């Protein structure tokens, strides 16, 4: 497993090429799938949550029938623990499009890791009331966790480091730093799901503090890559345990 992950996550500028912007989505911005999922996220998920009702309503808004669910379900494995495949695609769409938006921000000029990290956190603000459900889906054991959730978390970490021009680390330390950034993002989402402060001020403060903790590791990114994956898995397990406690 770790050899496969090494190939996927070793630094590669092709990962940031314009032609690959929407990978691993299997459709473009002008496709019905993209339009329906975007509409669902913007208009219906904040109220209804990540479910088929949000997708069907979005499809209806745009003049598409409920048959769009079949097209959206195609790229994913059969439903896991009562989570429909189309809903898994909606979650994937959310993760990918919000990550891709970081490239647009970076194109405007020099940006820091903190600026990009906070932008990604802010992108989840409209869904704050649905983050508990989102994190539950992301942490479900199975193919979606291995093939989508964890790879997307690592792609997010990689993009944050790449676009901010952060000092990077070679070889094994490369994995550890990305695991730490991914953990910071996951824990910030978990905090936001329970934050009741005005304008989510405490979440933003928490996000800055977690990012500072990543920076404070400095040259300590010398753990083996298995430990990096272990740490991220522990973060996902922490999410599951916290969600179970309510």
UniProtKB/Swiss-Prot annotation:
InterPro entries: COQ9_C, Ubiq_biosynth_COQ9. Residues 1-58 form a transit peptide. A 1,2-diacylglycero-3-phosphoethanolamine binds at residues 175-178. GO terms for molecular function: lipid binding. It comes from the Eukaryota. The keyword Iron-sulfur does not apply. It is found in: Mitochondrion. Keywords: Lipid-binding, Mitochondrion, Transit peptide, Ubiquinone biosynthesis. One of its GO terms (biological process) is ubiquinone biosynthetic process. The keyword Transit peptide applies. GO terms for cellular component: mitochondrial inner membrane; protein-containing complex. Coiled coil: none annotated. Pathway: Cofactor biosynthesis; ubiquinone biosynthesis. Membrane-associated protein that warps the membrane surface to access and bind aromatic isoprenes with high specificity, including ubiquinone (CoQ) isoprene intermediates and presents them directly to COQ7, therefore facilitating the COQ7-mediated hydroxylase step. Participates in the biosynthesis of coenzyme Q, also named ubiquinone, an essential lipid-soluble electron transporter for aerobic cellular respiration. Belongs to the COQ9 family. This is Ubiquinone biosynthesis protein COQ9, mitochondrial.
